[in-house]
């Protein structure tokens, strides 16, 4: 007999202290929380702790699919769970530093013991380590590596090892060395959301003296709560997510469409092998402010509408990207391999032409030219595309938009 849905009100500490591995499934989005999201979380916790309220603070509902033994598939709550772990690692480093510098006096003994208990608890969460194993890790930090608390297999996540690189670091400097850096980016812009958010938490914790730090950490672990809803049927878990997801980050067009493509792919491994390079190439072009994955979907929509001569129907309103793929032309998603080849073609065109002087000029001059240019160049055979063949259409677009401006 199938297990029933199991809802539980849990503190953050109890929720994260699991023997099973948290898992972000293939169809989920990439880690998208930014500094603004983390600042909001921090302010909520800080304000709640300052009020010294008796009632717990509620961080919403987290939905978990338990259909695979040993894993907790995060259907709703991946962004919060990842962020909680980044905050815990920042707390781990800061408490370690504070304990190292605290005077060994009778007056400080109680506070020191309380901070050590919090550190022990965080060790149990991040490294599945009891006190004995914690001592072994502190003697040889290599023992902390390879302990898996969260597995990310999302087809949309390019930086799957970032969380582990941060958690496995002994110091902040070690974490900074281990994480990915975007080339040609300066200051915090060179880091992923994972490290930027972790760094922000770590810096905020430096404003706290020993006693205030103890109160903050204890409050976060033992007074802040979530409702964990476990389901042993994935379809049931996703249905609950669709019903309850009113406070999470809105899903992007690419989030929705990639999930549908994944569900329709005849072979999941083959699809991942095709989709992940698309996401990586789109991310590289987005870093250069050329095009992102949502723009790729939009551009193919315009290309396909023009190819189908939809402008002849008299319907002049342009549909939203999501509606076009899921309602108006859902059959486009029935062949994931074919449509991914179209997306890949668009990305290859932009990768090739981004270096052309006229492209650089148009990118600075007017964003709207992209839809016109890609619709034209998509028709050009790949072997015939060159700066010479692209120049006439780009010069024409430059004149047109100069007049419109």
Label for each model-derived stretch:
Residues 2-307:
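Glycine- and hydrophobic-rich flexible loops that cap the catalytic core of alpha/beta enzyme folds
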Residues 208, 225, 246, 252-405:
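A cross-family structural signal marking well-folded subdomains
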């Amino acid at each position: 007999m199938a297990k029933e849905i199991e809802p539980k009100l849990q503190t953050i500490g109890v929720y994260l202290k699991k023997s099973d591995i948290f898992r972000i499934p293939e169809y989920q989005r990439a880690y998208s929380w930014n500094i603004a999201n983390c600042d909001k979380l921090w302010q909520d916790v800080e304000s709640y702790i300052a009020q010294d309220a008796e009632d717990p603070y509620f961080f919403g509902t987290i939905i978990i699919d338990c259909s695979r033994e040993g894993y907790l598939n995060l259907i709703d709550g991946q962004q919060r769970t990842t962020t909680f772990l980044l905050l815990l690692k920042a707390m781990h480093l800061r408490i370690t530093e504070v304990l190292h510098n605290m005077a060994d006096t009778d007056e400080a003994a109680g506070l020191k013991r309380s901070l050590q208990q919090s550190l022990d608890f965080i060790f149990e969460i991040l490294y599945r380590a009891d006190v004995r194993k914690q001592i072994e890790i502190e003697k040889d930090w290599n023992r902390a590596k390879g302990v898996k608390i969260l597995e990310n297999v999302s087809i949309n996540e390019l930086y799957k090892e970032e969380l582990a690189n941060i958690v496995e670091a002994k110091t902040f400097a070690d974490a900074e060395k281990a994480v990915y850096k975007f080339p040609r980016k300066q200051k915090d812009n060179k880091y992923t959301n994972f490290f930027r958010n972790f760094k922000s938490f770590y810096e905020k914790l430096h404003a706290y003296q020993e006693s205030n730090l103890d109160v903050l950490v204890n409050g976060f672990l033992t007074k802040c709560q979530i409702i964990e809803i476990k389901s042993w049927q994935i379809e049931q878990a996703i249905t609950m997510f669709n019903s309850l997801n009113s406070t999470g980050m809105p899903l992007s067009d690419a989030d929705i469409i990639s999930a549908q493509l994944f569900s329709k792919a005849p072979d999941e491994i083959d699809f991942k092998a095709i989709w992940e390079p698309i996401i990586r190439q789109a991310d590289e072009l987005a870093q250069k402010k050329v095009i992102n994955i949502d723009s790729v979907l939009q551009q193919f929509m315009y290309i396909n509408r023009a190819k189908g001569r939809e402008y002849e129907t008299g319907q002049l309103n342009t549909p939203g990207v999501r509606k076009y793929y899921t309602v108006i032309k859902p059959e486009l998603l029935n062949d994931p391999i074919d449509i991914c080849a179209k997306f890949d073609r668009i990305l290859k065109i932009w990768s090739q032409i981004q270096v052309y002087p006229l492209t650089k000029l148009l990118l600075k001059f007017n964003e709207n030219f992209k839809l016109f240019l890609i619709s034209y160049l998509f028709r050009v055979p790949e072997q015939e595309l060159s700066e010479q063949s692209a120049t006439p259409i780009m010069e024409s677009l430059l004149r047109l938009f100069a007049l419109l401006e």
